Amino acid sequence: MPTINQLIRKGRVSKVENSKSPALNKGYNSFKKEHTNVTSPQKRGVCTRVGTMTPKKPNSALRKYARVRLSNLIEVTAYIPGIGHNLQEHSVVLIRGGRVKDLPGVRYHIVRGALDTAGVDGRMQGRSKYGTKRPKQSK
């Protein structure tokens, strides 16, 4: 327990909370060739590789992921949600934060229905999360 005098001299230092999606907290100035501290909710990037990986212990699947070089020159691993996708190398994608609990090192999600990423075909519920347009009403 500190004394009053110690608190007057030093004071309490509040903990700094680390970001869970650090690549979204950096911008890049291409003229000055330096990183800037500009935060953004999403970032654009180019896929450098697209593949599948297996999840951690109790689960079993082939989860789709893409390695993405962002516009701030940081390379991250992003999860491709939904069933089926049209991504390949050099596809331009939009990523958002949000980790995948059973894939180590995957801290970002690709936004479906934005830029080169198509929405999920035949999706009827939760369409907004998968970039699917509303189906036409037949009379």
From Swiss-Prot:
Record flagged with keyword Zinc-finger: no
GO molecular function: rRNA binding; structural constituent of ribosome; tRNA binding
Coiled-coil features, chain-numbered ranges: none
One GO CC annotation: small ribosomal subunit
InterPro entries per the UniProt record, alphabetical: NA-bd_OB-fold, Ribosomal_uS12, Ribosomal_uS12_bac
Pfam families, per database record: Ribosom_S12_S23 (PF00164)
GO biological process, one term: translation
Modified sites of kind 3-methylthioaspartic acid: D102
Signal peptide coordinates: none
Keyword terms: Methylation, Ribonucleoprotein, Ribosomal protein, RNA-binding, rRNA-binding, tRNA-binding
Family note: Belongs to the universal ribosomal protein uS12 family.
Function as written in the Swiss-Prot or TrEMBL entry: With S4 and S5 plays an important role in translational accuracy. Interacts with and stabilizes bases of the 16S rRNA that are involved in tRNA selection in the A site and with the mRNA backbone. Located at the interface of the 30S and 50S subunits, it traverses the body of the 30S subunit contacting proteins on the other side and probably holding the rRNA structure together. The combined cluster of proteins S8, S12 and S17 appears to hold together the shoulder and platform of the 30S subunit.
Subunit structure: Part of the 30S ribosomal subunit. Contacts proteins S8 and S17. May interact with IF1 in the 30S initiation complex.
NCBIfam families (alphabetical): rpsL_bact
PANTHER family membership: 30S RIBOSOMAL PROTEIN S12 FAMILY MEMBER
The protein, known as: Small ribosomal subunit protein uS12
